[in-house]
Amino acid sequence: MEKANETSPVMGFVLLRLSAHPELEKTFFVLILLMYLVILLGNGVLILVTILDSRLHTPMYFFLGNLSFLDICFTTSSVPLVLDSFLTPQETISFSACAVQMALSFAMAGTECLLLSMMAFDRYVAICNPLRYSVIMSKAAYMPMAASSWAIGGAASVVHTSLAIQLPFCGDNVINHFTCEILAVLKLACADISINVISMEVTNVIFLGVPVLFISFSYVFIITTILRIPSAEGRKKVFSTCSAHLTVVIVFYGTLFFMYGKPKSKDSMGADKEDLSDKLIPLFYGVVTPMLNPIIYSLRNKDVKAAVRRLLRPKGFTQ
């Protein structure tokens, strides 16, 4: 295991991966490669149909196209490096490349948190205030909503990455992770990281707490409105328009809260299990969730399935 001199600055990092579990690495390589291909194909198809099919030129599918593009960017910022790490005995990464990866991953994660809350608002207006939907969710409204999600996520990423790269790293240069995950990198700093911790807590409130509360309140009103519909068929039809989004929210935020909110183990055996889970949970969040998103939206949405069929038919969008 490489260590930098205790007084010399770290010029690069070593990614530790699953070195304690070498028997799993080939299996994980194949699984992650297959999932990455599904992510590219599934999200790529969703982006195509939301652009090419005029029937899907609505706020909901505009947000969905943004989410699909974001998932491709998010996984591409880390998965190729993860795959490469399985093929090399010891994966090293330069300080600057690590900073770029931290920035991209953080920006994509923050943007997705806000995008999901914007999508919840879209569903709230569509179900609870349908007569004013076209006025409230006009193009002049939903495009700035999406743009602000990207801008705020990017700004937060710049702040956190800037704070992280200004820290001195003069000791252990081994990142106990697949990628340059910001929390794993901060553990290697040989200086006080109080500012980083405080800023991270503030960010957690902005990107986790506030969106979850907003989404929760939106769905309280949505479910209340659905329950007032007299027919069971009517309730089922209306709920189907937001069930895919609700499923994605539960998977996405459930993984995030488990990753950042779970208690830490104190005994050595528990620490070993925690060490493995600290790698597998972000892997699930960074690969499995983006893979599930297009599957969930295509299985739960008749419009998307019909658009995909039209895409596969010659001249399907010309009719």
UniProtKB/Swiss-Prot annotation:
Glycans are attached at residue 5. Keywords: Cell membrane, Disulfide bond, G-protein coupled receptor, Glycoprotein, Membrane, Olfaction, Receptor, Sensory transduction, Transducer, Transmembrane, Transmembrane helix. The chain crosses the membrane at residues 27-50, 59-80, 102-121, 141-159, 197-220, 238-260, 280-299. SUPFAM superfamilies: Family A G protein-coupled receptor-like (SSF81321). It is found in: Cell membrane. Residues 1-26, 81-101, 160-196, 261-279 are extracellular. GO terms for cellular component: membrane; plasma membrane. One of its GO terms (biological process) is detection of chemical stimulus involved in sensory perception of smell. Disulfide bonds join 98-190. Residues 51-58, 122-140, 221-237, 300-319 are cytoplasmic. GO terms for molecular function: G protein-coupled receptor activity; olfactory receptor activity. PROSITE patterns: G_PROTEIN_RECEP_F1_1, G_PROTEIN_RECEP_F1_2. Its main location: membrane. Pfam families: 7tm_4. It is a multi-pass membrane protein. PANTHER family: OLFACTORY RECEPTOR. Odorant receptor. Belongs to the G-protein coupled receptor 1 family. This is Olfactory receptor 2S2. It comes from Homo sapiens.
